[in-house]
C-alpha cells in the first residue's frame, strides 16, 4: 500500500516522461484524477482514462511530447507532504515560473491552479508544482 498516493503518481509521471514512454499507469484516487484534469487542461499530458480491472481502478495517462520528442513535463514536485503540510494564502499564490508553471492547490472550492485560487480569492494546501 502506498502512503502518499500523490507523490507516487508524480514520481510515476516523472519517470515515464524521462524514459519517453507514451503511457503510464497510476493508482486511482479522486484527488489524483483532479490533479490530472489540471495537467491535461494546461497541456502537460495528452489524455487520461480510468479503467476497472479485477475490482481495482487504475488511471492510464498518455504523456505529451513536443515535435522534437521532448517531454512537456520539465519537472514535477510534491510540495505539501504528509509529514509537513504547506498552506498558502491567496496573496502568496501569484504567478509561478513566469506563467510557464502551475501550482496545484487544494482549496475549499476544490483542487485548482494557483492562478484560479488567486482570482477566486482563496488559499489552501499547496499539493504540487509542475513546469
From Swiss-Prot:
Belongs to the universal ribosomal protein uS8 family. The gene is rpsH. Part of the 30S ribosomal subunit. Contacts proteins S5 and S12. PANTHER family: 40S RIBOSOMAL PROTEIN S15A (PTHR11758). One of the primary rRNA binding proteins, it binds directly to 16S rRNA central domain where it helps coordinate assembly of the platform of the 30S subunit. This is Small ribosomal subunit protein uS8. Keywords: Ribonucleoprotein, Ribosomal protein, RNA-binding, rRNA-binding. One of its GO terms (cellular component) is ribonucleoprotein complex. It comes from Helicobacter pylori (strain G27). Signal peptide: none annotated. GO terms for biological process: translation. PROSITE patterns: RIBOSOMAL_S8. InterPro entries: Ribosomal_uS8, Ribosomal_uS8_CS, Ribosomal_uS8_sf.
